[in-house]
Amino acid sequence: MASVNKPRTVGVGLLGSGVVGEAIQDTLFHDLSGALGKEIGLDLRKIYTRNPKGKKWYRKRPALFTSRAEEVLDHPGVDIVIEALGFQSVRQLPQFRDYILRAFRNGKSVVTSDKAVLARYGKEIWSAAKRSGQQLRFEACVGGGIPVIRSLSESFAIEEPEAIFGIVNGTCNYILSQMEKSGKPYAEALKEAQEKGYAETNPASDVNGSDAEAKLILISWVGFGLQLQPGRIWRKGIEDIQAVDFRYAGRIGGSTIKQLAVAQRKGQAVQVFVSPALVARDNFLASVDGATNAICFAGKNSSAGRGERDCDYVLVGPGAGGGPTAVAVLGDVCELARSERKFSGVPSLIPPGMLKLQAENDIDVPFYVRFVVKDRAGIVGDIGRTFGRIGVNISEIWQLRHVEEEIQSLKQSAKLKQKYQDMLPFVMTLERTTLRQMRKALDSIRNRDYIVIDPVWFPIWGGK
């Protein structure tokens, strides 16, 4: 009788027992007799968390838990370390980086779901992986359950990416979707997202765009070889968007508003930004609803002659949550378990240094601008002349009849006390211009005595 070769056992250590860490434990412990245990040979050998006794699996498997991270990082039977600590403050990031570096020094490969650590310390971490000869995998950092990194590596192996863009934060997409559907003010939509578990108690990293920024840093690294740092990307949050903006968006070609992360090649530079954007209804991204994420890819050759809104294919799915993220993490772990786990290089499709980051002020897009001014003659003309002097061309001007509820919502968002008749909202769409010109024009306009609320402005994606 022929002997059956059993897979060698691969020891796994887990840092973190929060939402993602617990979902990883659920999958591994429920599958001990299944594919992960028998066919791949995964064996979870140690779990670090600060307070083990309160955790779901502690009662059944107390010996696996520890409150000392070094018991995972220095464990002789651990081959792969999963870092799923989930940061609450940037002050934690140096420590999480040190955990990853220690794992490499001890000859262990690392799988992480922590985008913030890689966005800030990616270059240092990759250098350490190379020195140690170990692997680093981070599929879960970008798309949660969507295989963004794997798709980039496989699909663009024979051609360079031209653009990678899409919706990478489910919290923001849920909030904006609710504002559009129900007409709720931003504050109410955010509260609902928190009640349903889509937004954290402190939602700042989601709504101000920093979560999307970290993901975009990794996308730009893999797709374009850019080694960026947080703070170098132009970033706008969604906090100033109000339901009235969706009414105007609907009138402007049936558009909607989505928070987009964009990396788009412009010659030898890459235009990179995170911002809410006006998206035309015929664009696929306009139909992506709720907490769903979607990422579009366009190749340099196949995109020739097409508009920047178009893409070769789209990945859609749940971008966050314990279950989808655990699937992505364990997919990386399984891939490492099947391989020799030797360092295979930085996974950039374009060698680092070939392309540069486009200067922030040179970002070149059309814009949507919502003004709220005092109701008196000559204001629209004055604003138009200011844009004209700076070389910014107005495409259209929109003024809707506003119900009092919309006016009250605008007043509350800006904490104003002006009477209803004193406020006149209207929208301008601007032809393609640079961020430098846009800022110069708005700096000139915003301090004039007729401005009631600071202008709300953001790109029109795919506009001419």
Predicted features, each with a name:
Residues 15, 328, 333-464:
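A conserved regulatory-domain signal marking ACT and ACT-like small-molecule sensing domains
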Residues 21:
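N-terminal Rossmann-fold NAD(P) dinucleotide-binding loop
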Residues 31-58:
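NAD(P)-binding Rossmann-fold cofactor-contacting core
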Residues 62-95:
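A structured beta-alpha segment of the ubiquitous adenosine-cofactor-binding alpha/beta core
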Residues 88-105, 113-153:
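Rossmann-fold NAD(P)-binding glycine/threonine-rich loop
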Residues 130-211, 218:
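Rossmann-like NAD(P)H-binding beta-loop-alpha module
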Residues 161-165, 173-176, 180, 192, ...:
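Catalytic, metal-anchored helix/loop core of enzyme active sites in primary metabolism
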